[in-house]
């Protein structure tokens, strides 16, 4: 029973680390703007495919994370520090927004595309640099454990749950936009930004401690 509880906690920790970074609420406005000319069924299809692409992208980096780090000679503490800086930067941009994540030109190009599920929805909106950095970090953590295959499966389940939550949120984009409004969406985005800063700073602290202990 203990192994089940430990596995469940690992899955939930994966969701807890990924969800604030993926932040599907921040993509609601993008979905509403670039799918304005689509029917509900077409919008749902694009959202579903985007979330599937997100799962595939992050799972690919989960599997290849160790290979990438070994190829470039990146240490785990170094990855944690770099990932923490990226996550903190994304958090600061959400907490103190001064520029739009996607320019008007990119929005216009996306609106003109027949398929917007891969870009800009799946990448970079849902699976951007921050979430990729976190997944690569989890990949290296799994490889240092005793049950590598089980660890990969647990993280993959966490990614799948995050993708499903993102699908539910984006599927309800129209209702969320009406209920929360611009002010509510902005407030939620700032809260997520603060959480990202906390997560990023903790990544940096863990990375620095790893360097100190390894010296």
Where are these regions (language model features)?
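Small-residue-enriched transmembrane helix starts and helix-helix packing motifs
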Residues: 1-20, 97, 104-122
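Interfacial loop-to-helix junctions that mark the boundaries of transmembrane helices
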Residues: 1-15, 70-81, 144-158, 212-215
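Juxtamembrane transmembrane-helix termini in multi-pass membrane transport proteins
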Residues: 10-62
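Generic transmembrane alpha-helix signature in multi-pass membrane proteins
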Residues: 19, 28-34, 119-124, 132-144
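Transmembrane-helix boundary and interhelical-loop signature of multi-pass inner-membrane proteins
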Residues: 39, 60-83, 165-210
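Membrane-interface alpha-helices at helix entry/exit sites of multi-pass transporters
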Residues: 39-52, 146-157, 186
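Membrane helix-loop-helix hairpins that form the core translocation module of multi-pass transporters
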Residues: 44-98
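Transmembrane helix exit motif
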Residues: 86-107, 199-210
């Amino acid at each position: 029973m203990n192994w089940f509880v430990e596995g469940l906690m690992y899955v939930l920790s994966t969701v807890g680390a990924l969800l604030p970074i993926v932040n599907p609420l921040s993509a609601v406005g993008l979905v509403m703007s670039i799918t304005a000319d689509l029917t509900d069924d077409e919008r749902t299809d694009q959202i579903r495919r985007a979330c599937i692409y997100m799962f595939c992208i992050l799972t690919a980096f989960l599997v290849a994370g160790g290979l990438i780090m070994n190829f470039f000679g990146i240490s785990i503490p170094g990855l944690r520090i770099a990932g923490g800086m990226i996550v903190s930067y994304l958090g600061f941009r959400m907490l103190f927004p001064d520029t739009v994540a996607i320019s008007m030109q990119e929005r216009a190009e996306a609106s003109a595309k027949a398929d917007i599920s891969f870009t800009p929805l799946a990448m970079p909106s849902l699976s951007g640099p921050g979430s990729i950095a976190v997944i690569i970090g989890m990949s290296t953590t799994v490889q240092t454990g005793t049950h590598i295959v089980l660890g990969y499966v647990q993280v993959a389940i966490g990614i799948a749950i995050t993708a499903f939550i993102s699908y539910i949120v984006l599927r309800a984009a129209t209702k969320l936009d009406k209920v929360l409004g611009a002010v509510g969406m902005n407030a939620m985005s700032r809260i997520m930004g603060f959480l990202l800063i906390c997560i990023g700073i903790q990544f940096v602290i863990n990375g620095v401690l790893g360097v100190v202990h390894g010296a």
